[in-house]
């Protein structure tokens, strides 16, 4: 709408003026939204015009959708219902036992129908086992599974969870939901890979796999980017944006962190939920395979999935 367009123009205007006045880069997060699915295109057009004026404005975006994870390992879309909420503090094994209790399960199904969440079930996707896929379509949605089974979305959620002993995960990509939009942004010269969330919402979002997914999907599977270009986009390009000239390059005297990758065997399974925070609190993790070694300042920091004990990192300070 016109009000939205004016808001975007106002934002780009002040960023442009700030960059022109200071000579410094300005960066911001950019993603496609469901409510305004083409607004990102307007932003790209505007920052392109700003770049022609000499402004250094760069958007940061992701290599796939930004999604909330649902599952009985932690939170579900139906937790406003008391019977669902009552499971929150149980172990996964105890939750599965409750789900297999026909009387309790019937109560859960009934309450999920009576108190449905304000969410579109056709936009919640079942993550497959094995190598994870995020490029899912309507046929993979919770609503489609419910229609196929002839049950409500809440009952389908339970059914799909029990197929995997409660470990089934569901992804709700609320930003960057369309891969064509992601590709459009990744191809744009004023867009840098960034914007991942794996800390602030560690029980809801798992974005630490974004670099691996970029290599696995956009490079290896889609062959949309050459491997050399992809490595540059993950390393040198973001380092240059923040004027870290001694990072992101293989050069004598630079503080390079090196990953030795078995590219043919690069794998990315679905996230898992672990309880390794203080007081037994939980978080999502996502372990990839195919990284043989990670070297930090010349020392082997990780060998496979195992930390070697080396602590060779140094605090980064702006020059």
Language-model regions, residue ranges each:
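Generic beta-strand/beta-sheet core signal
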Residues: 1-3, 29-31, 59-64, 194-196, ...
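C-terminal helical cap
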Residues: 132, 140-148, 153-183, 214-265
């Amino acid at each position: 709408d016109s009000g939205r367009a004016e808001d975007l123009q106002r934002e780009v205007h002040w960023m442009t003026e700030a960059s022109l006045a200071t000579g410094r880069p300005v960066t911001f997060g950019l993603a496609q939204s469901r409510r305004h699915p083409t607004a990102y295109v307007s932003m790209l057009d505007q920052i392109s015009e700003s770049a022609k004026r000499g402004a250094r404005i760069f958007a940061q975006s992701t290599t796939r959708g930004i999604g909330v994870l649902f599952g009985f390992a932690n939170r579900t879309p139906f937790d406003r219902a008391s019977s669902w909420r009552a499971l929150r503090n149980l172990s996964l094994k105890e939750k599965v036992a409750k789900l297999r209790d026909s009387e309790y399960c019937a109560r859960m199904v009934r309450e999920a129908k009576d108190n449905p969440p304000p969410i579109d079930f056709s936009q919640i996707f079942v993550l497959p086992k094995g190598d994870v896929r995020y490029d899912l379509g309507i046929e993979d949605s919770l609503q489609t599974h419910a229609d196929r089974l002839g049950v409500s979305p809440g009952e389908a959620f339970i059914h799909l969870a029990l197929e995997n002993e409660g470990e089934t995960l569901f992804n709700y990509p609320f930003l960057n939901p369309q891969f064509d939009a992601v590709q459009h942004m990744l191809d744009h010269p004023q867009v840098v890979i960034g914007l991942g969330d794996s800390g602030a919402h560690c029980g809801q979002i798992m974005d630490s796999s974004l670099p691996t997914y970029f290599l696995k999907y956009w490079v290896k599977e889609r062959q949309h980017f050459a491997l050399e270009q992809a490595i540059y986009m993950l390393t040198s390009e973001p380092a240059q944006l923040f004027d870290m000239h001694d990072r992101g390059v293989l050069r004598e005297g630079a503080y390079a962190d090196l990953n030795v990758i078995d590219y043919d065997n690069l794998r990315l399974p679905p996230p898992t939920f672990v309880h390794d925070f203080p007081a037994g609190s939980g978080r999502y993790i996502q372990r990839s395979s195919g990284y043989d070694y990670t070297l930090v300042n010349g020392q082997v920091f990780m060998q496979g999935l195992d930390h070697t004990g080396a602590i060779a990192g140094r605090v980064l300070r702006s020059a």
